[in-house]
């Protein structure tokens, strides 16, 4: 079945359609990860986006439910060069084509993804449709103008989860990955709270953590979270990962900006000036270095100098994903350092 990728710059690319027959729309971005396709597709940070896999071969190993980062696929569609759509079923009991059909996710195969990635790198992220009919797609609204966090979070409200640690963390869930929650529970007990919760009404916690998530960190719907963090700077230890770093930086008075094509993949090197860490990234926004105030920039991306870690006396946040999944475990020390700082603050 022929299917088309229609982009906001007027490009129309024909390919083979699989997955759901629905029309998909979103911001067109790419990942350079060569493995972890199911983890990427179920990562809530991809809400509102169509994901191009730079790796030419996708779905060449079985689908395993245990690696899913949320209950459902979160991307708006996928673009592949050579997808093994009829790969024998894994623990999900489905081949790739049937899995995407059941999830309501459209996909297009046979695309020159190398050319498409170069196009995005040179011109910046695009907006795109995946559709069976190439005609009638002239409206390309900005998905980042939506409240994507509301679509990314699987559970609303406040929930207590007992972990292996005694210290309790107020975990502000903006679209967290399962692996991240699991790693946090290895060190702490969590008070899970969605962004629309009354955060000021929650008490009896030792530190605050802000999770990853999708969209524009300066979206009006997130202003209550930013203001809550402002009120707690210097009061409670504050930690964050990925989107969480950007939210924390806004609370400190810094600004964020939209990157040309972002960082998405499991092979991004960052440095603190002494050591180099290979890390997993998934972000299309970053902190404006000209607006840094009241905190120290500890790590930067080796390739483009993007701010990748910030800290002050009671705050620490990274732009990358130390929990990885997929990706390297070079920076899992972040969780131990969180625990140490939380313990020190609790002891006064």
Swiss-Prot record:
Full protein name: Carbamoyl phosphate synthase small chain
Lineage, opening ranks: Archaea, Methanobacteriati, Thermoplasmatota, Thermoplasmata, Thermoplasmatales
Record-linked HAMAP family: CPSase_S_chain
Organism for this UniProt entry: Thermoplasma acidophilum (strain ATCC 25905 / DSM 1728 / JCM 9062 / NBRC 15155 / AMRC-C165)
Positions annotated as active site in the UniProt record: 242, 321, 323
InterPro entries named among the record's database cross-references: Anth_synth/Amidotransfase, CarbamoylP_synth_ssu, CarbamoylP_synth_ssu_N, CarbP_synth_ssu_N_sf, Class_I_gatase-like, CPSase_GATase1, GATASE
PROSITE patterns: GATASE_TYPE_1
Family in the record: Belongs to the CarA family.
Complexes and interactors: Composed of two chains; the small (or glutamine) chain promotes the hydrolysis of glutamine to ammonia, which is used by the large (or ammonia) chain to synthesize carbamoyl phosphate. Tetramer of heterodimers (alpha,beta)4.
Reaction(s) catalysed (UniProt annotation): hydrogencarbonate + L-glutamine + 2 ATP + H2O = carbamoyl phosphate + L-glutamate + 2 ADP + phosphate + 2 H(+)
Stated role: Small subunit of the glutamine-dependent carbamoyl phosphate synthetase (CPSase). CPSase catalyzes the formation of carbamoyl phosphate from the ammonia moiety of glutamine, carbonate, and phosphate donated by ATP, constituting the first step of 2 biosynthetic pathways, one leading to arginine and/or urea and the other to pyrimidine nucleotides. The small subunit (glutamine amidotransferase) binds and cleaves glutamine to supply the large subunit with the substrate ammonia.
Region span, CPSase: 1-167
Residue ranges occupied by any Glutamine amidotransferase type-1 domain in the UniProt entry: 168-348
């Amino acid at each position: 079945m022929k299917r088309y990728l229609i982009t906001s710059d007027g490009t129309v690319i024909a390919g083979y359609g699989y997955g759901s027959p629905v029309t998909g729309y979103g911001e067109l971005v790419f990942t350079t990860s060569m493995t972890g396709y199911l983890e990427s597709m179920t990562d809530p940070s991809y809400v509102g986006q169509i994901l191009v896999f730079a790796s030419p071969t996708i779905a060449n190993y079985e689908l395993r439910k245990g690696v899913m980062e949320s209950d459902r696929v979160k991307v708006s569609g996928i673009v592949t060069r050579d997808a093994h759509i009829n790969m024998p079923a894994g623990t999900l009991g489905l081949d790739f084509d049937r899995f995407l059909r059941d999830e309501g996710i459209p996909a297009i195969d046979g695309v020159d993804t190398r050319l498409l990635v170069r196009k995005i790198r040179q011109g910046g992220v695009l907006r795109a449709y995946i559709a069976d009919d190439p005609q009638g797609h002239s409206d390309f609204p900005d998905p980042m103008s939506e409240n994507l966090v509301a679509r990314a979070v699987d559970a609303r409200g406040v929930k207590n989860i007992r972990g292996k640690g005694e210290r309790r963390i107020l975990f502000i869930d903006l679209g967290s990955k399962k692996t991240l929650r699991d790693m946090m529970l290895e060190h702490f007990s969590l008070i899970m709270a969605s962004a629309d919760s009354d955060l000021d009404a929650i008490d009896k916690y030792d530190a605050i953590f802000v999770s990853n998530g999708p969209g524009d960190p300066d979206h009006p719907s997130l202003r209550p979270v930013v203001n809550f963090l402002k009120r707690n700077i210097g009061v409670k230890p504050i930690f964050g990962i990925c989107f969480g770093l950007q939210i924390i930086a806004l609370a400190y008075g810094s600004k964020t900006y939209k990157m040309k094509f972002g960082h998405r993949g499991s092979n991004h090197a960052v440095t603190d000036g002494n050591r180099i860490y290979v890390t997993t990234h998934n972000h299309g926004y970053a902190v404006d270095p000209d607006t840094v105030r009241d905190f120290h920039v500890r790590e930067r991306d080796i390739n483009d100098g993007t701010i990748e870690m910030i800290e002050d006396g009671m705050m620490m946040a990274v732009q990358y994903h130390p929990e990885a999944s997929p990706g390297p475990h070079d920076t899992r020390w972040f969780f131990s350092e969180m625990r140490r700082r939380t313990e020190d603050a609790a002891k006064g």
